[in-house]
Amino acid sequence: MTLNQWQYGSKSEELVLQKYLEMDYKLIVQNFEYRLNHTAGRLGEIDLILEKDGRIYLVEVKARNNNKFGPVADQVNKNKMAYIYKTYRYFIIQREYRKYREAFFQFDLAIVFKNEVKIIPNAATFDYY
């Protein structure tokens, strides 16, 4: 059975989440969306937000079965980072997540290629925002 693109992406996120959980990370939220209201379109999304030892990890999951469109990591550019940072700023002002406002955070990129997970810790910085 072949998976469609959405199913493969969802399965890949679960593989990455399992890997983080095995390393004693705690899941805060999966697929956090930045929306101003329920009728407006999505303004941002973070695949996984995790916590370990007081640090917050923002994880972008990229999954591919081939390199037809070039290396997966190349798809996380400055615009994508701005999108993630904007979403993170929205995340920390939400009532249930305010306790994380003072926490140090980092961005990890998780690449799933042919069902193999590779995590690139601290893959990029938010210095230019």
Positions of predicted regions on the chain:
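Active-site metal-binding core of divalent-cation-utilizing nuclease and nuclease-like domains
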Residues: K26-I56
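Conserved catalytic cores of phosphodiester-cleaving nucleases, focusing on short active-site segments
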Residues: I46-N67, I84
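Positively charged, solvent-exposed patches that mediate nucleic-acid binding
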Residues: E51-K52, Y100, F105, Y128-Y129
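Protein kinase-like catalytic core scaffold
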Residues: R55-Y57, D108, K118
